[in-house]
């Protein structure tokens, strides 16, 4: 769909950019998700970590805006919107589709502007150079697409649990199809690894994303790499939130101390 100019503020849902925030954590949601899933993080992480939930169009407060089906266009316009906020240390967290978006955004920022995040957290998605573990469904007719969504593990189960959600699901169908198009049509291009630290996080009970899928992220950084596997399925970022936030906080602490030392 054709894109129009959007105010940079529309891309961020109540970002926590206070004076105390020494590092901004831009957080990217999964397919079919929205920035609101990260609001609780703002209360649970220390004030030195400014959680900035990124809101893609076609959902929540941007429901009436056209959604993306081309990742390269999304990345270019997302970079332009976030650039004014990248004047202090920042990090990326992305879950599932969000991990892919944040990875390509980090590469774009490096190539076009010579800037990089201090750290990147890739959660619940196989490394980008690996083939998609599932069969593509974005091109299927609505009924088959919905059937595919029910069998795949990448969409919140709550959408399918009762008939009351059926009307909502029909409304969300174009956005869901667009998100899956982004993921399933992605073509990895070989480049130099990122120069920032990278943490890969997966769920032990995720039927599609294995330890090997997460370990393969190591290829994409020339800096430090660590991997964590948490209990839970694909949506462990909700069920294991406390443990996940502990990993994020402990990882970013070293950057906070360093930044304070500069001042």
Swiss-Prot record:
Q: Which GO terms describe its molecular function?
A: oxidoreductase activity
Instruction: Answer yes or no on keyword NADP.
Output: yes
Which keywords has UniProt assigned to this entry?
Antibiotic biosynthesis, NADP, Oxidoreductase
Alphabetical GO biological process terms = antibiotic biosynthetic process; lipid biosynthetic process
User: In the UniProt entry, which residues are flagged as the active site?
Assistant: 96
Which Pfam families does this UniProt record tie to the protein?
Answer: Thioesterase (PF00975)
InterPro entries given for it?
A: AB_hydrolase_fold (IPR029058), TEII (IPR012223), Thioesterase (IPR001031)
Is NADP given among the entry's keywords? yes
Q: Which family does it belong to?
A: Belongs to the thioesterase family.
An additional note in the Swiss-Prot or TrEMBL entry is:
The reduction is strictly NADPH-dependent.
- Protein name as it appears in the record: Linear gramicidin dehydrogenase LgrE
Which organism encodes this protein? Answer: Brevibacillus parabrevis
* Phylogenetic classification of the source organism: Bacteria, Bacillati, Bacillota, Bacilli, Bacillales
Q: Which gene encodes it?
A: lgrE
